[in-house]
From Swiss-Prot:
Belongs to the phytoene/squalene synthase family. GO terms for cellular component: endoplasmic reticulum membrane. Catalyzes the condensation of 2 two farnesyl pyrophosphate moieties to form squalene. It is the first committed enzyme of the sterol biosynthesis pathway. Required for the biosynthesis of ergosterol. It is found in: Endoplasmic reticulum membrane. Its main location: endoplasmic reticulum. This is Squalene synthase. The chain crosses the membrane at residues 181-201, 294-314. It is a multi-pass membrane protein. It is an enzyme of class 2 (transferase). Pathway: Terpene metabolism; lanosterol biosynthesis; lanosterol from farnesyl diphosphate: step 1/3. One of its GO terms (biological process) is ergosterol biosynthetic process.
Amino acid sequence: MGKVLDLALHPLELRAALKLKFIRQPLFSTNDTRATPQLERCYELLNLTSRSFAAVIMELHPELRNVIMVFYLILRALDTVEDDMTIDPQLKVKVLREFDSKLDTTDWSFDGNDLKEKDRVVLTEFPCILGEYHKLKPEYQKVIKRITGLMGNGMADYILDENFNLNGVQTVKDYDKYCHYVAGLVGDGLTELIVLAGFGSDDLYHGKNSFQLYESMGLFLQKTNIIRDYAEDLDDGRSFWPKEIWSEYATKLTDFRDPKNTQKGVDCINHLVLNALTHVIDVLTYLSSIHEQSSFQFCAIPQVMAIATLAKVFNNPEVLRKNVKIRKGTTCDLILNSRTLKGCVDIFQYYLRDMKQRLPVEDPNYLKFNIQVAKIEQFIEEMFQDNLPAGVEPRETMIYLKVQERLKWDTQVIPRVQEEDYKFNMALSVVFCVLLSFYFFTK
């Protein structure tokens, strides 16, 4: 009932939800996801573990759909081992370190998870996933195995790191390193897969600054989640906020839960948001380098969700008490409006300006925050250069040329969006006429 009321109070979001549900069509047919019982079961497992990820994976180009589905399930299985506190640490470390080698088998499975672990089925039915993994092109298998090995060993290292287990994340450098292992590596693997498929520019993975770009894609998402999950993580007896930042505002991380320390907690949240915003320019550069439309949407949707979530947690004391989320209708609106690069940039600008407007002058990082937002705004100006005086030619910078290339693909998307708007407006007109007729003839 709450979600329905939310939509009713936000008519533009209601419009977006209806368009997404009834009007918008996927780019590709999904019939081939049921080609065999084994493949169909893998997609069922995907839906069981994450409906949101399943939705975006299902809309991918057939060349990458099964690849990324298998990649996700393998990393989910790895994460399910790492997350389960009932598994003996020695056994857990062994399984994590050897996980990539299990991909060479056809029948390995693991039933050592707690029976209450909701995702244990991914491990008990792992042979099903292995069957689909071995059907992938060798170059795709190689990427998945490499990332699985790096991530498994990274997880094992953190389990054995007594200082981390006792004191949590200490420095901003440690914070970035932790986010690298849990999210940056995913960005690494996905980027290589996209480039191998020919769906992104070659320099996206092999360029001089490519590591920084795909690393930022992962870190921006992970840092957003870490900021948002403060209360939930503390309830679970853990936290990933870096001490280098939070110690500027409190003696203990739990101090922020005391109502008298709320303002200090909010100042810390804003500082962490500022840290996350340092990745935005890289994120926009990365998105400018994706050509194939379904891959673009796959990459863009989580990023626009992240900037919307950052705006939600920004200057928000509720974060200290509970997990805050963006509205369902907002999510629908973001999905529809992030199908073009210009649409994504508009979303980023909207939320950046919203945060800037709400930033209190008394905030300890007021000046730094404004400088960071100004840097991003200036970069966006360089991306498009569409407000130049008459007679002035745009500077052909690297990002400008990337954007011009991406805009060629955007022009193919715009007619599709316009057609959806037309169909929705026609449907709305029909419904309105029917209701009006009903009212007129029954009066």
